Amino acid sequence: FDEWNTWLGKIEVEGGSREQQIKFYTDLWHALLGRRVVSDVDGCYLDQTSDFPRICRIPLSASGKPLYNHHNFDAWWGSHWSLDILWSMAYPHLMDDFCNTMLDMYRNGGLIPRGPSGGNYTYVMIGDPAVSFFATAYNKGIRNYDADLAYEGLRKNAFPGGIRDHAGYEHSKDAHSGGMEYYIKMGYVPDGRANVVGMHTTGASMTLEYAYQDWCLAQMAKAMGKQADYELFFERSKNYKNLWNKASGFMQPKGTDGEWLPDFD
């Protein structure tokens, strides 16, 4: 009870009815569910990003305590609409833990994840939602992690071979169904790509995700003084325009031949 009061008490509300206040704190409680500390008191945690499960350990302080907690949860996908903002305002220490968790996975498995689950990569949904998470944290001064290493991993994800190249639920190590080669070469991810696997493979959705994530990476690059990368990713963030069909009034998928795809709804 006291523990939940501490977490929920980070935000105090005034006014409104009692029912509205109950609803607010119930929703805040929901926003804090689903994330689990999986590291032990000695800093050990299970990592499954390699071919075999192994025990890894968080660095310890001079007093022998872990410098942060290692967490597991579902994918980050969609968190930029609300949770990133909430956590950065009310629970910055939690964002630091999450950022360090993702960097643990980058060190262990070679990719910053969409979301660590069971000590492994989930490949749920599409894109690289971790970049908006890191950009939020970094630009709000939440930086108790290796920011240079984070940027290195996020930049890797923004090119072929990174996490974006995994379509939704595409688990193979040599994933390509995310269409990053098309995105870089053509300025959008087309539908009708050959040899595509996975559950979420639609090119228009990928293009819009990648463009937004490029914008986020551009903001982080700018804040870190990486001007060339800022210009690169800011320019790439305009790729969403390549799928705007003025005639239909919608974002509309294209094929590999550059033609609009009909009956796309």
Where are these regions (language model features)?
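A conserved hydrophobic secondary-structure block that centers on an alpha-helix together
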Residues: E14-S17, S63, N69-I85, M89-G115, ...
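Secondary-structure capping and boundary motifs in well-ordered enzyme cores
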Residues: E19-Q20, N69-G78, T122-A130, S205-Y210, ...
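Structural helix-adjacent loops and short alpha-helical linkers that scaffold large soluble proteins
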Residues: G16-Q20, R36-L46, M89-C99, Y138-E152, ...
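Alpha-helical support elements that line or immediately flank enzyme active sites
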Residues: F24-V41, H71-M95, A135-G141, W215-M224
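Long, well-ordered core segments of solenoidal/helical folds
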Residues: R35, Y91-P113, L149-D165, G179-N195, ...
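Catalytic cores of carbohydrate-active enzymes
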Residues: P113, A218, K222-D265
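Active-site-adjacent structural elements in folded domains
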Residues: I11-G15, D42-N72, R114-Y121, A167-M206, ...
